Amino acid sequence: MRNDKIAIGVDIGGTNIRAGAVSNDGGLIGESFSVSTNATERKELILSRIVDSISRIITQNKLSISDIQGIGLGCTGPLDVKKGLILECPNLPTMDYFPLRSEIEKAFNLPVFMNNDANAMMLGEASWGAGRGASSVLGITLGTGFGCAIILNQKIWMGATETAGEIWISPYGDGYIEEVVSAAGVCKLYEKLSGLKASSKQIAHLANEGDQFAKAVWEEFGKAVAFALSWSINLLDPEIVIIGGSISNAFELFYPSLYESLVKTICPVPAQNLKIVKAQLGDNAGFIGAAALVF
């Protein structure tokens, strides 16, 4: 039996399932594992992949059940966290109202902790990443969608109905802010300006190469993120703002317009101390954050 405390974290998205063993100081133990979710298949098959991912982490890293303190699940939502249910989830369309937590508990006879992927990821960043040591963290994830998490004293603030941080639905222009502050929004604006189709990753590359249309896209993107954050910063006065998700790889491209816009729209005192940083845990952030739910 090992002396250190270990949790298994699982990041469950519409595209991939990623799992890893994590120590209570945030260190990755051994190798992680990833498999395609195949989200349109039957729920039993998706559950089987989740269970198999956890089993592989245990066997390939030569762990025993007695070594493991618990299992953390960071899952695309919406969720009923108290009941451990996936609700009507567009990214997992065959798993509506599926009791995921209890199924994993039955499979391994271990405590299982579950939260949405944005909350889990930012708990990991607050515990072991860019927000380590901060008492209040506001985190956003930018990628396929727009997620937000509030971490106070190393605990996720869920709100009365478990929907704290759902700012993606904030009105913006003729629609919602997520329609702009997402990979699809980046691609749509670039096509509108240039007449060309490209992925968000390609648009970041083009901007770095000097493409004026691509640079304009990231400038507008930063302004939109600032709009979304300004209300939250004025309300919460967080010690640090962390930006993660796949689009955070373009952080240097949109940060200047984000910062410039924010300092004009938030209260003067927090504006003087504003700290906005890129997430640090990288591709492992999802399952490391899920493991943080256990400790």
Per-region residue spans from a language model:
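Active-site nucleophile and cofactor-binding loops and adjacent substrate-binding regions
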Residues: 91-93, 113-119, 139-142, 277-283
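Conserved PLP phosphate-binding loop immediately N-terminal to the Schiff-base lysine helix
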Residues: 115-129
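Short hydrophobic alpha-helix segments
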Residues: 32-33, 90, 160
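A short acidic/small-residue loop/turn micro-motif
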Residues: 36-38, 94-95, 163-166
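Glycine-rich phosphate-binding loop of actin/hexokinase-like ATP-binding domains
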Residues: 130-184
